[in-house]
Every structure is written in structure tokens, then in C-alpha cells.
């Protein structure tokens, strides 16, 4: 039995879940999300909890049991609390600006890099060097944060670049030089 898959998911107040066959719709104060389940997994709501169960003990059913339990739990957390990723920009003259759904990054290239955020994703810039990506879908928030980081990943010699707030960048020593 999957240790993750067998845990029931608590359903917070103001969050409703609608299960129609293999289709799930979760609505909450921050928005709504939908998910189609594979045939190996079923979802049942019992009072204030949601349980994900597998149909049989085949290998694919066992693999997907824990995965879809986590996906449903992330949907419930997303519509009730939301998700956010914070990125720090380090480097002389490196900065970011946000205008509506557009993020402009000045990170050492000849022209600024402009990125347009998809619908449902909010981007904010705090003191020109910290970018906050937030939304209700954990997968999209993580992908957008990874794309922003990919514009200028941190380099190991001086540490310049865009990094996650909790990321540790291993530093390297430069060339030894002549003696």
C-alpha cells in the first residue's frame, strides 16, 4: 500500500469538491481547478475528508495511487491558500520590473528580457531584486519560476544570476594565477 496514497486529505472550510466519474473539480475562495483521473484510481469524499483509492494492485495502479493523491491535495491547498515561489536576483545592475502580467528582467544582456505570465499567475517585484510568483496551480507556479531562473541561472564564481530564495549555490575558486 502506498504510504502517501492511503492518507486521507482533509477538506478545509469553504472548499467544495465535485466528483463526476473520473473528473474532479475543486472550488475554493481563490478559484477553481479541474483534473481528469486515470482508470486505475478512484476518489471518494467522506464528510470532511477525501480519499484516493486504487482499483487493483497492478504496477501502474500502485504508481499512480500516491501521485494522484498528491495532485488532489495540491489542488485543495491551491484553491484555499495558493502557492508562491520567491526568486532573488544578484548582480551589479541586475533588476526586475513588473507591469500587470508582464515581467521585465535586466540581467546583463544587451536588451531587457520580457516575459508574459499566463492567466491565473501573479508576479510581483519587491525592491527590484526579489520576484514573487504566485497562483493556485502548483505545477504552473513552479514552471514559471523555473523559466525565470533559466533566463540567468546563478554562476558558481561570483554568484551572479537569478536563484530561488532557499537555494544554495556552491561557489568555486577562480584561477590560481601566476606566482
Curated annotation (Swiss-Prot):
Keywords for this protein: Ribonucleoprotein, Ribosomal protein, RNA-binding, rRNA-binding
Keyword Ribonucleoprotein: yes
GO molecular function, one term: rRNA binding
GO biological process: cytoplasmic translation
SUPFAM superfamilies in the cross-refs: Ribosomal protein L6
GO cellular component terms, A-Z: cytosolic large ribosomal subunit
Role, per record: This protein binds to the 23S rRNA, and is important in its secondary structure. It is located near the subunit interface in the base of the L7/L12 stalk, and near the tRNA binding site of the peptidyltransferase center.
Assembly behavior: Part of the 50S ribosomal subunit.
Name the record gives this protein: Large ribosomal subunit protein uL6
Source species: Crocosphaera subtropica (strain ATCC 51142 / BH68) (Cyanothece sp. (strain ATCC 51142))
Amino acid at each position: 500500500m502506498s504510504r502517501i496514497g492511503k492518507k486521507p486529505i482533509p477538506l478545509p472550510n469553504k472548499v467544495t469538491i465535485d466528483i463526476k466519474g473520473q473528473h474532479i473539480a475543486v472550488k475554493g475562495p481563490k478559484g477553481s481547478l479541474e483534473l481528469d483521473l486515470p482508470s486505475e484510481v478512484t476518489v471518494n469524499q467522506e464528510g470532511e475528508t477525501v480519499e484516493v483509492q486504487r482499483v487493483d494492485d497492478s504496477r501502474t495502479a500502485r504508481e499512480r495511487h500516491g501521485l494522484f493523491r498528491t495532485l488532489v491535495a495540491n489542488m485543495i491547498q491551491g484553491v484555499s491558500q495558493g502557492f508562491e515561489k520567491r526568486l532573488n536576483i544578484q548582480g551589479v545592475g541586475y533588476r526586475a520590473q513588473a507591469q500587470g502580467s508582464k515581467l521585465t528582467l535586466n540581467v546583463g544582456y544587451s536588451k531587457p528580457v520580457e516575459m508574459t505570465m499566463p492567466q491565473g499567475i501573479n508576479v510581483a517585484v519587491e525592491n527590484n531584486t526579489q520576484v514573487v510568483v504566485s497562483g493556485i496551480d502548483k505545477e504552473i507556479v513552479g514552471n514559471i519560476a523555473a523559466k525565470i531562473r533559466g533566463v540567468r541561472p546563478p554562476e558558481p564564481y561570483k554568484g551572479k544570476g537569478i536563484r530561488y530564495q532557499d537555494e544554495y549555490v556552491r561557489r568555486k575558486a577562480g584561477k590560481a594565477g601566476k606566482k
